[in-house]
Swiss-Prot record:
Comment on bound cofactor: Binds 1 zinc ion per subunit.
SMART domains: tRNA_SAD
Protein name stated in the entry: Alanine--tRNA ligase
HAMAP family: Ala_tRNA_synth_B (MF_00036_B)
Keywords per UniProt: Aminoacyl-tRNA synthetase, ATP-binding, Cytoplasm, Ligase, Metal-binding, Nucleotide-binding, Protein biosynthesis, RNA-binding, tRNA-binding, Zinc
Cofactor: Zn(2+)
Amino acid sequence: MKELSSAQIRQMWLDFWKSKGHCVEPSANLVPVNDPTLLWINSGVATLKKYFDGSVIPENPRITNAQKSIRTNDIENVGKTARHHTMFEMLGNFSIGDYFRDEAIEWGFELLTSPDWFDFPKDKLYMTYYPDDKDSYNRWIACGVEPSHLVPIEDNFWEIGAGPSGPDTEIFFDRGEDFDPENIGLRLLAEDIENDRYIEIWNIVLSQFNADPAVPRSEYKELPNKNIDTGAGLERLAAVMQGAKTNFETDLFMPIIREVEKLSGKTYDPDGDNMSFKVIADHIRALSFAIGDGALPGNEGRGYVLRRLLRRAVMHGRRLGINETFLYKLVPTVGQIMESYYPEVLEKRDFIEKIVKREEETFARTIDAGSGHLDSLLAQLKAEGKDTLEGKDIFKLYDTYGFPVELTEELAEDAGYKIDHEGFKSAMKEQQDRARAAVVKGGSMGMQNETLAGIVEESRFEYDTYSLESSLSVIIADNERTEAVSEGQALLVFAQTPFYAEMGGQVADTGRIKNDKGDTVAEVVDVQKAPNGQPLHTVNVLASLSVGTNYTLEINKERRLAVEKNHTATHLLHAALHNVIGEHATQAGSLNEEEFLRFDFTHFEAVSNEELRHIEQEVNEQIWNALTITTTETDVETAKEMGAMALFGEKYGKVVRVVQIGNYSVELCGGTHLNNSSEIGLFKIVKEEGIGSGTRRIIAVTGRQAFEAYRNQEDALKDIAATVKAPQLKDAAAKVQALSDSLRDLQKENAELKEKAAAAAAGDVFKDVQEAKGVRFIASQVDVADAGALRTFADNWKQKDYSDVLVLVAAIGEKVNVLVASKTKDVHAGNMIKELAPIVAGRGGGKPDMAMAGGSDASKIAELLAAVAEIV
């Protein structure tokens, strides 16, 4: 077996499959594009679903890739096991309706065992297979695999919902008896026992059925096009080929671990407690790649995942004695390790470091808050005479403040308290169940549509015309091909068409189809790409249509021009964003409609009003500069040399279109555009908002809509000026400010009067002191305007020794507000209010010294006040 670096393994994999006629698919962005079923790209096949479900037919049915992936189902296990990672690389080879089982197994065995390639010893390889899949068993035998090395496993059948499915065969490497101390042997495989002896290095999925959840597996229909989907983990291959005990001792992780040793002054012990080193090395890889791909830490979705990873890594850094910000210092090391295939980490190093460091600094402040929360919890335990920190509280420290359980346990034990491990596990499981229920594993591939996939007739989109005559090649009605149609809805393919099929954020054209008499025979309501790339027109049929007949195709020209204004403006906006807020502000999605444009981009904070003003000004300057717009068809490399910006998540063919707007903007784009920027007329941003962690959205309008937006603003300003009696529009702001200042002064004066009134009223309330169980208490209903006034009462009460406990109730509108304050350790305000609040159909809580609740049944206020003596 050859001893190869991870970069050599990756390259040898790709070279082998290229020698078998495969094209190399570049690694896709970790942030999925147009796939709501995925939080992250989580496998090599995730970006190829369009090929497997038949919605797109690839130019080459043989594909290979090395795909960066992220899975975060069990973050808490990372660092505890030898092979668990958040970010990993999946090596794959795929056949879309081309070769199948025989070639997949034979070539796979060749790659693994040939001296020209990986040169694995054959006697160290074991394979599992689906018991009913005798063909795979026989093919392995034909390759020279001993029957004793073939293990039937009932679970070796791959399916996720409706769509492609089939048996799979897995390949394992036997590391020997040293990794099998109990000498269990092949039962480890047969019974799926977690072990370090048999390492799964490759899974070959034989996708041959269309899974249908409504029928038994034995009744699944064969796919019209059988597929091969395989996945081999680079980290596992590297561990085996480099003789590493775990994945972390490979060249993918050790350089990071060495840097952590320098930062911490601690030494990594392969056989000792090294969890913190592993966590940091794993998490900084995921953070570096994900942030480089446009995801940013936040409080929801993938942003929350990144925040959790970073905080977990920081806490493990603290366990190693690293108390300052340090993670950002590891980004260059990650980039250097992966540079040969993923240069983007080093290219975006400054931005990634900036985001990581800023998030570390924010978390440092959060840690202080978490420590304060823990101190409060421990003080509460002491006051209640308890000795165990509840699981739900431990989970809150873990989930909200990023405290690992080990840290909470250590701090609690130092203070003399135990922790509720089982309660924590229960709370953790509830969260995991919620997370798993919310995500479809990998996403269903979807059923293959044989009718659409069978369209092979050529069709060409003509960019430079709004109308042309063309022959009707294909009619599909009720999902079947037909020679003619006279009513209902149908799908049509023409030899050539002026209708743009929806793509790249630009909506489809609409229009009409006419016969040779000039009569409209169909209305085009949508155009999408067929699996083989032809524009597929969805039409409402008004009169007879037949294959082989020529028709005149006319798009709605006015609508197209409006869409083009927005699309061309989108390119200008993209360039302006780069200039004003930074190169990191790359496109994360767009929509160019007739009435508006919508542009999503990566950015870590709201765009300020001043920045929006500069962006809007810059776009309009380019419109007024009347820049010539040119399009060039060339190859991708030449386009990049021209400075063309490739858009987020897009895949490009051999020939690409470069859209250039003067010397201001150069992008790869397959859409339609104006001839000159001046045709846009005017550009106006109408909204900027956040749509997720690290993603912002701008909605803008152009031309007539932009003029109307400005006019509406002017009308609104005129109304305001009239209301505040400003003599001119320019005076309106000063008038509004003066009114605001006056209102603030009045509100302040009003608040002061309320405080004086409350203080006066408090004198009467605080006179009515009662006693029960040796505790002096005041329980009274008060007439106040809001809950804030109750707190003012409590503040006044604290100033003197009126009583030990204060209970106030107020009916405010339709709600009942309750306040409990306590000066004695014998009465916990938070616990007391939990007993009182249900009386008025409410609930609440709080700290030992202060608690509040809200209720809805004012008729029970007297009952609540009477209950105080019993509860106190």
